[in-house]
């Protein structure tokens, strides 16, 4: 049980409407344990607090209002406002982030509304946001709606109409492969192949100033976005956010769909560029739609997402642990925020041009630290990682609003780019999952359908052979159909080695009668 101390709200700090300091963070007064380390705002065990936040966030998202044109608010705006529509359009990776998070969330909760929402978002982007098949950069998604309530995505927030971001296109392609595996709908596979083919057609070998694809490019003319500032011309020729694109290519190769030889060749070229440049220089480059081309920035999301990709692909290099550890070290050294050391936590700033600690960035860094611990056995930062996750709970209000510290309620950072980090942290360390519930935490396949009941957990997935990790804290496994099982009763962790697309786990109640479903 956690012994709690509460820092009073009125200790002379300069409180704004949502102050952020070591006494109060966004919505809540800071709580600490007996040793002075930050704990979740609710005062609960982290496993309880994380689960509560995840459920509240999903509930807020799915019940968000529609805009005047009948389109869900989260498909047209990057920032939530309760009484009026924000003047800004979609976040650059907003749909991709939500698709990635909801894929994990569906396995965790089994709520059929989750895949329905995923289908709605993917279909809307495919139908209202792709570049023309006859464009130079064809069949790629535009990341922004320049006419906010037009119902169409047609450009880039800073570069303007006609521009797109190839890294976000690669991410969408990877999510379309996942959605094809989930639903069996060939339109998603077709969309992924078209994105991959378009990217292959424009890849370059790259150098220290040019990535294999630019960050912003005009779909019709091929012009890389430019901006002049203080007499100097800047070009949007560089970013390092290519691990999702590598996932797109490998996903299509595994399915034997599209020009797999060209995908393999392009992936090898991109991998070589990453190893030669960003891994060697820590020049991670831009990611965010609202940062102008002239304001070059190195971002936590690009760096730590690459570290996660490397850890999940042991054949990437002989030195995966050292490379991933080096990236995590750079993120901490360059973007660690030391304003909260009184409560024994160092959250992570967003990027070099915006040195403000973020709910999404801090929780992502923490989840990758826990993955690093799981894969390498080096767990020196494990305690700090959990405190980072605890710190990021304070941005979530009881009703599921999730506000970026010192900023707005971003539908990127607070939703799609938040939930996934807690679910991945639970998968690496199941002790962070609820102690009285049953949940699927991880699969090497894609879940197509899952149902939880007191007597059994049954799920269907894309691949026959796969590995699943579950936390069974409400039940005890009796038997499994469709695979073999290994039960760790002390950790309440069940590992399934599946040999069938359909798996059913028969359950027994816990002897102590505790647990809920």
Positions of PLM-derived features:
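Boundary at the C-terminal end of the N-terminal hydrophobic targeting segment
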Residues: 8-12
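Terminal, non-catalytic domain-edge segments
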Residues: 13-69, 120, 176, 182, ...
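Carbohydrate-binding/catalytic loop surfaces
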Residues: 70-90, 136-163, 209-243, 281-308, ...
